[in-house]
Structure formats: C-alpha cells, structure tokens
Amino acid sequence: MVGLIEQEPLLHLKKLFEKKQFDKIISFCNDILKNDSKNMIALQNLSTAYIMVGANDDAIKYCEIVLKMYSSDEHALKNKMFAYEKLEKHEEVISCCDIILTKYPDDIDSLVTKGIALNKTGMHDDAIEIYKTALKKDPNNIDALMNIAVTLKFLKRLDDAIKYYDKIQILDPSVKRASIEKYEVFTELGSSDDAFLAAQGITIGEAKEIKMQAKENDYSVQHAYSLRRFYKLQKTNS
C-alpha cells in the first residue's frame, strides 16, 4: 500500500501524465532523486517519461538502476523492453521478454513483443510458435492473430494466413488491415471473387453463402453481394 507521504507525488505525476507534460515529469522526478536516489516512484516514472519523449537510452539507464535493486521488477523490465524495441535492438528485446516470461508466463504483451522481435531477426518459424503460445492463453488476442497471419503470409503459407485474417474479421470487423491483407492473399491465389468479398469485410462463412446464392441464381458474386447488402439495409430500415 502506498503511504500518505507517497500519494502526493503520485497524484501530481498522474496529472502531468494526463496533460502529457513529459518535460515537467522528468524535472519533477529528477528533483526527487536529488534527495532520494533510490526513490522507486521517481525512477519508474522517469523511465516511462523518457520513453514517451524518445530518449530511449536514458529510459534504459533508469530501468537498470531499478533492476540492480529489484531484478524482477515488472515495470522496469517492460519499460526496458519497450525502449529496446524503439531502438530496434531485437536481441535485447528477446532477452527482456524471456526474463519477464520466466516470472509472468501468461503475459500476452511480452509474448507478442517477443514474436515481433523474432520476426525482425528472421526467425519466423520461432515467431509463429510464440504467437501460437499467446493464442492458447488468449485465443481472441487481435495482436497475436494479426502478427501470425502476417508472418504466414510472408512465408507464403497463404491458406493458413487466411484463417487468421478471417478470425480477426469475425472478432473485430473494424480492423480494416485484416480485410486488406486477406484481399491480397486471395488475389495472390488467383481467386478474384474471394478477393472481392474479402475487401468488403466478408468472412469465409458469409462468402460461401454469397457464392452459393450466385451459383443457384446464375449471376455474378458481385451481384449476389449487392443484393444481400440491399436486403440487409432494407430490413434495417423497415
């Protein structure tokens, strides 16, 4: 529990973060550290503020000060991970993720971050396994789904990629990137009708119904889609 003496700087820092006054946060934390060089509130918030202003090397410096005192501090490990990610030091990112995951094996953000770092170092098969691990823990995690889909697409495992893009569309139709990427995959496979429907945000299940309707009535998939959309709008407005 945070003591009464500690509440005042925490409340002040919260207000500064809400206003995105990062320079003032840095100055405030440095003032605290002049009197108390091991003050955790100042050290942790200072590293966060440095990340926000792009001073990632400085952020890492203060994370390491914390980690010398508390080697498994989650806040410091994550800030260090984020800072290395910004600096594109992918091996260091992987190392930070491994330390976090040793203590917090269900940390989805760290799993996905490790997967991305593995992608960046060309270890795509390992990245896929990490994303699968994340999805076993959280099957509906959009970040993990998107990253495994993009990786599979890059590796030309197109049929596998489609399944993940489709799940994203089902879970969150507002993720337009899934529709675009799925359209590109179907285009690469030479399936123009499926590509058209994917671009409209249509899922595989819906696409099967539309294509069946087009076949039964002997008209184009585009026409079947337009009719389906018209009837839906008509039903909504009635």
Residue ranges and their predicted role:
Residues 12, 46, 80, 114, ...:
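Structural register within alpha-helical repeat arrays
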